[in-house]
Amino acid sequence: MATKIFSLLMLLALSTCVANATIFPQCSQAPIASLLPPYLPSIIASICENPALQPYRLQQAIAASNIPSSPLLFQQSPALSLVQSLVQTIRAQQLQQLVLPLINQVVLANLSPYSQQQQFLPFNQLSTLNPAAYLQQQLLPSSQLATAYCQQQQLLPFNQLAALNPAAYLQQQILLPFSQLAAANRASFLTQQQLLLFYQQFAANPATLLQLQQLLPFVQLALTDPAASYQQHIIGGALF
């Protein structure tokens, strides 16, 4: 495609030159002399009359003298500048076509570092725009790790106890709701601790345990409202 464009531009430049040029017969020597300005030395004009040396001598004479630019050169300069700009564009496209495969090969060879750079790109932009937020994000995994470490440290004695003595660990698991209740409501926990002593005392005697179950509402009433419990005892004594 680039070759076709270059060929068309060269044809355009040649057609411009041909359209602005004047055709003279080869046997005539007058046109060359007429093209030379009158202020050139006469020896240059005589040398240019030689047919073999005419093209070369004419070029030398024009290049050595300070001849004003002719209208023909002014007409040819836009076409030449256009050709030069297009040639530069074609060269840039060819260079790009040569460089892009090399870049792709480098990316494929270093795909892992390239992917890491793409992943870290938002963090780099954030560190540039807002360093404080970037530092918070950097400290966030450390904070999460510290929280998990503290939880593991708290559970470490229970894990060691479970490994050494499973029975004691199960007892602790059974008592865990009571511990949570103690943390949430201390009064209810104390009530349960008082009732636990009664359960442990009468667990060996089922009959006594049944009596304790029957008396449990009165015990709870005595713990919550001693005055009402005392009144119930007086009423019960009067009835019996």
From Swiss-Prot:
GO molecular function: nutrient reservoir activity
Family named by the database record: Belongs to the zein family.
Lineage: Eukaryota, Viridiplantae, Streptophyta, Embryophyta, Tracheophyta
Organism whose genome encodes this protein: Zea mays
Note: The alpha zeins of 19 kDa and 22 kDa account for 70% of the total zein fraction. They are encoded by a large multigene family.
The protein's name in its UniProt record: Zein-alpha M6
Keyword Iron carried by entry: no
Signal peptide interval: 1-21
Keywords assigned: Repeat, Seed storage protein, Signal, Storage protein
Matches recorded under InterPro entries: Maize_Zein_Storage, Zein
Keyword Repeat: yes
Described function: Zeins are major seed storage proteins.
